[in-house]
């Protein structure tokens, strides 16, 4: 796995192939949750994420970035939305890519992943004490971006 920057955007390359679309699929999302409970996997990823952050200005998203990976980050935002809204967004993303999916199943999967991640032994999903809570359930993507840019400018 390699992380590269192409045309100003971060790309995740697996065996030299750009797999950004693949890593955002529901299947990978669930596999991520299942494999993140293994200490050796978490340790390696923790090292890689911290190495990336030390060498670059980064914006990272993830379920334990503010509490475990980068606990001293300059700005931490606990970005959330209701399970139904996240399911709707994922459904629309998949539809745009031509992927058939079931909205109700996506929501069930999101709820199951949340439960699993909140209750895992190692680095459970939780808001960092110094993170800004931002519920985006009733916000458009443009509103979310505007809010985050405002928070960055204030930091």
Which functions belong to the PLM regions below?
Residues 1-27:
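N-terminal phosphate/diphosphate-binding loop that engages ATP/GTP or pyrophosphate donors
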Residues 14, 75-79, 134:
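A ubiquitous short alpha-helical element
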Residues 4-6, 49-55, 63, 68, ...:
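Small-molecule kinase domains that catalyze NTP-dependent phosphoryl transfer to phosphate-bearing small molecules
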């Amino acid at each position: 796995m390699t992380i590269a920057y192409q045309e100003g955007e971060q790309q995740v390359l697996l065996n030299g192939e750009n797999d950004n679309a693949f890593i955002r699929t529901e299947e990978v999302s669930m596999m991520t949750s299942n494999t993140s409970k293994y200490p050796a996997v978490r340790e390696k990823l923790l090292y890689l994420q911290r190495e990336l952050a030390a060498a670059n200005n980064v914006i990272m998203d993830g379920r334990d970035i503010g509490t475990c990976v980068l606990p001293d980050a300059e700005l931490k935002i606990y970005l959330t939305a209701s399970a139904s809204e996240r399911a709707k967004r994922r459904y629309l993303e998949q539809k745009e890519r031509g992927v058939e999916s079931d909205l109700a199943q996506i929501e069930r999967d999101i709820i199951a992943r949340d439960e699993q991640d909140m209750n895992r032994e190692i680095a459970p999903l939780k808001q960092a004490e110094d993170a800004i809570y931002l519920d985006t359930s009733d916000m458009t993507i443009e509103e979310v971006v505007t809010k985050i840019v405002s928070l960055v400018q204030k930091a």
